[in-house]
Amino acid sequence: MATVREKAAALDLSALHSPAQRPPGFSVAQKPFGATYVWSSIINTLQTQVEVKKRRHHLKRHNDCFVGSEAVDVIYSHLTQNKFFGDVDIPRAKVVRVCQALMDYKVFEAVQTRVFGKDKKPAFEDSSCSLYRFTTIPNQDSQLGHENKGTSPSRFSDALFKSSDIKSDSLEDLWENLSLKPTNSPHVSTRLSPQVINEVWQEETIGRLLQLVDLPFLDSLLKQQEVVPKAPQSKRQPDMVNTSNYLDRGILRAYGDSQEDEWISAAIDCLEYLPDQMVVDISRNFPEQPDRTDLVKELLFGAIGKYYSTREPLLNHLSDVHNGIAELLVNGKTEIALEATQLFLKLLDSQNREEFRRLLYFMAVAADPSEFKLQEESDNRMVVKRVFSKAIVNNKNLSKGKTDLLVLFLMDHQKDVFKIPGTLHKIVSVKLLAIQKGRDPNKDTGYIYCQRIDGREYSSSIQKKTKDQLLSLLKTIDEDSKLSAKEKKKLLGQFHKSHPDIFIEYFGDSF
């Protein structure tokens, strides 16, 4: 039986259901085609936009996987940007249920690994540690292509559920179960270039960060907007030395894959960023007894710690933000600090972000008190903090206490700090939709707490407020019993000279 993914591919949904190829007069409320279109576009968007690559999950390496939190980010962004349900505010929890439905209908599946001898329950998790893989049935590709050739989009809803054991009356029923109601108005949009989308994300991330963190200067953030991503360096042609280095890395990677030890797996992942000579030294000094994991861990921790003690700090950009986040932590505003950290890390380029993610994961595992004892006289958590603090933040304007607090906070929340906040998703979606519809994208940015008014109204408001304040000042002078008659007369005379109209309005012509 074919899966949804094969049937979607056979129908060529990437072209048929792209935003630029919507049918004339399309409305999401149309049944059953409306819901069919939404599901098809969600599947296509997920398959084309989520990052699929080789990842680790509970001690083992798995090919062609994506993480749960990124799937939620992609679908959430797609639903809100395309306004399938009008202006309804879609909570992240609802998107998690959409992902659960897609998993139930075999669009993708959870990576099956055993933890303590038990299979993980097939429940979708919005986590950077939960891995999923798209389902495929290679033997049926040609058959599906022939079988579905010429299938109309209106019949896709029937085909969608034939491959599933789960009973459902229609696609519309599932939307109703999710408490989401489609909009009745047609929605027409055009494709936006990746450059425009990236610029909007960058701009709104900075804008939201400024809303959460009090910064004395904006120079660092303004410079951040001007940063141009560096072009990746071309790979060198293999020679004898490079081949040897490659083999050393391959041997260490193979060793890591063979070990059912999360600590070693996390450490091996960090070796990818170490220079070749250090990797060669690790390989040459590897214990003759590989089962002596204590010696292996001691070697790996020492090498990784040595490299990051001399490396430029990963988070040394936007140093003013460090103080802002640390101040939030000092004041007990953990949730706001977490969102600010998520925004801060969103501004990292992809390479540094991935390197920091691996390092932070290794730090969190190594800091576990039940893991390998790093130093006999010290707690693992304190050792990790001491060794890697300068590799993360080395800010002269940040006190040692705040630096320690920030590093420990990152370690404790390493599963959440790389998620994209739902608030940012909504802000970006509103702006992208405005651009798509040709409206002023700055009219409703999502984080301005005032109402836009025209010039005449602004001028009138200024005059009224000024007049009210002058009348209040005049009343204060007139009713102040502490002023002597001479002093009061002097002040009133000065006021009359400067603002005669206000003076006459208050006292009249009889004064």
Swiss-Prot record:
In terms of superkingdom, the source organism counts as Eukaryota
| BP GO terms, sorted | intracellular signal transduction
Chain ranges of the DEP domain? 46-136
Q: Which Gene3D superfamilies match?
A: Winged helix-like DNA-binding domain superfamily/Winged helix DNA-binding domain
InterPro entries attached to this UniProt entry: DEP_dom, WH-like_DNA-bd_sf, WH_DNA-bd_sf
| Family under the similarity heading | Belongs to the DEPDC7 family.
Q: Which PANTHER family match?
A: DEP DOMAIN-CONTAINING (PTHR16206), DEP DOMAIN-CONTAINING PROTEIN 7 (PTHR16206:SF9)
| Protein name from the UniProt record | DEP domain-containing protein 7
